Amino acid sequence: MPSLLLQLPLRLCRLWPHSLSIRLLTAATGQRSVPTNYYELLGVHPGASAEEIKRAFFTKSKELHPDRDPGNPALHSRFVELNEAYRVLSREESRRNYDHQLHSASPPKSSGSTAEPKYTQQTHSSWEPPNAQYWAQFHSVRPQGPESRKQQRKHNQRVLGYCLLLMVAGMGLHYVAFRKLEQVHRSFMDEKDRIITAIYNDTRARARANRARIQQERQQRQQPRAEPSLPPESSRIMPQDTSP
């Protein structure tokens, strides 16, 4: 029985949703300490370098990013304030002005009431539309409203249509170029075949003429030469004797 009582809190903790634990952690963090300036919000000292401020902002942004708990508006507000603090302290001129205002201001402190933090007043005055500055810092992230989703869907469809159009146009150009190349190659091969055929026919005709001439010369050499025949004796004319 005592072992069951000891295991009961652990089982209850396992059954709690993850988002609820994040909300409780955020609420406990907000109640534990309220930063009074941008340096305390980022968790750095006033003499920190720009690289230290950048690393602190990345660390804090992972802890307070709205994607960890989209249904928690307090987490979004803290992240926007963190974004504003980094925007001011990451630039040399704005940081110099902020340090001057921070050192020159002397807010009165009373036991019965607490003054509102200075960074909160500047934050409320600087991000009148909070979403505009938030989304301007992170251009790759867009609000997930129904209207924005519809516009994003239309944009994606338009881009897809352009890609398909370019692909079809590329295929058409490739086909036309291939057909043209095929015609050029075919005409070249036909011309080459015509030249080769003409050379072959000419060579064949010359070979036939040479063979006929050689055969004729050979036949002439093989025939014997005929000797000139004497006329017969009866046909010989005797010379007449003209003596007295």
UniProtKB/Swiss-Prot annotation:
Regions crossing the membrane: 159-178
Domain of life: Eukaryota
GO cellular component: membrane; mitochondrion
Ranges of Polar residues composition bias in the record: 103-127
A Pfam family hit: DnaJ
Region (Disordered): 96-127, 208-244
CDD domains: DnaJ (cd06257)
Membrane topology (UniProt): Single-pass membrane protein
Occurrences of domain J (ranges): 37-102
The entry's keywords: Chaperone, Membrane, Transmembrane, Transmembrane helix
InterPro entries: DnaJ_C4 (IPR052763), DnaJ_domain (IPR001623), J_dom_sf (IPR036869)
Subcellular location: Membrane
Tagged with keyword Membrane: yes
Protein name: DnaJ homolog subfamily C member 4
Lineage: Eukaryota, Metazoa, Chordata, Craniata, Vertebrata
